[in-house]
From Swiss-Prot:
Name by which UniProt lists this protein: Retinoic acid early transcript 1E
Glycan-carrying positions: 36, 154, 212
Superkingdom in the source lineage: Eukaryota
GO terms (BP aspect): antigen processing and presentation of endogenous peptide antigen via MHC class I via ER pathway, TAP-independent; antigen processing and presentation of endogenous peptide antigen via MHC class Ib; immune response; natural killer cell mediated cytotoxicity; positive regulation of natural killer cell mediated cytotoxicity; positive regulation of T cell mediated cytotoxicity
Misc: UL16-binding proteins (ULBPs) are unusual members of the extended MHC class I superfamily. They do not contain the alpha 3 domain and lack a transmembrane domain.
Record organism: Homo sapiens (Human)
Main location: membrane
Keywords annotated in UniProt: Disulfide bond, Glycoprotein, Immunity, Membrane, Secreted, Signal, Transmembrane, Transmembrane helix
Region (MHC class I alpha-2 like): 117-207
The encoding gene: RAET1E
Ranges annotated as spanning the membrane: 226-248
GO MF annotations, alphabetized: natural killer cell lectin-like receptor binding
Length: 263
């Protein structure tokens, strides 16, 4: 068998290292925008029936409530967004989405097994990697119970709680509703994410402590930090295996010269 010399294949190793760096960039370079809505079927006077929190890369920077129909900026990022033309559009959209979600809650309330006032928790999520949208989804919980997941990328529903099966069938039949969810998460959310990232990347460092978004998000398009670390570790191990194989075939392992070859 022809021996493969380490010095005769530098291009191969450089290409492998380049692919490794690209893979790591894709894994850790993702950005996300998350809108968390809490909708109440009934609210006391002076208390909002809709509240929303907006997270960029898990950092809370905007808050909204229906009582005054205003968006409150938080931290330096929130103040930067406040000074843009996007602010008015965002305020209007949050109000419209809140009203639409409240109508959905009224529609499904008879299917919720409780006589008490009901709440609907909704998370709209979008993600970008390598300059493109790689994730868009909606997650729903009724009265704190996780119920449904809608993947706007492939227009599919997942039932989390079997009691939400009827709700899922009702919404699935409404093609206009599905298109509405897709437009908001894959269209508007992704557009805002691109806009906000310009301000995020211009900041020297996050000025708002990371706050985890609602734990009702289970989209497979979002990679948890532990999986990013595990993936990077696996890639490094694979690189080590390839290098060992090259040195082994070059006969340096047996000669006791690995990894001290200088020529």
């Amino acid at each position: 068998m022809r021996r493969i010399s380490l010095t005769s294949s530098p291009v191969r190793l450089l290409l492998f290292l380049l692919l490794l760096l690209i893979a790591l960039e894709i894994m850790v370079g993702g950005h996300s925008l998350c809108f968390n809505f809490t909708i109440k079927s009934l609210s006391r006077p002076g208390q909002p029936w809709c509240e929303a929190q907006v997270f960029l890369n898990k950092n809370l920077f905007l808050q909204y409530n229906s009582d005054n129909n205003m968006v409150k900026p938080l931290g330096l990022l929130g103040k930067k967004v406040y000074a843009t033309s996007t602010w008015g559009e965002l305020t209007q959209t949050l109000g419209e989405v809140g009203r639409d979600l409240r109508m959905l809650l009224c529609d499904i309330k008879p299917q919720i097994k409780t006589s008490d006032p009901s709440t609907l928790q909704v998370e709209m999520f979008c993600q970008r990697e390598a300059e493109r949208c790689t994730g868009a989804s909606w997650q729903f919980a009724t009265n704190g119970e996780k119920s449904l997941l809608f993947d706007a990328m492939n227009m599919t529903w997942t039932v989390i709680n079997h009691e939400a099966s009827k709700i899922k069938e009702t919404w699935k039949k409404d093609r206009g509703l599905e298109k509405y969810f897709r437009k908001l998460s894959k269209g508007d959310c992704d557009h805002w994410l691109r806009e906000f990232l310009g301000h995020w990347e211009a900041m020297p460092e996050p000025t708002v402590s990371p706050v985890n978004a609602s734990d009702i998000h289970w989209s497979s398009s979002s990679l948890p930090d532990r999986w990013i670390i595990l993936g990077a570790f696996i890639l490094l191990v694979l690189m080590g295996i390839v290098l060992i194989c090259v040195w082994w075939q070059n006969g340096e392992w047996q000669a006791g010269l690995w990894p001290l070859r200088t020529s």
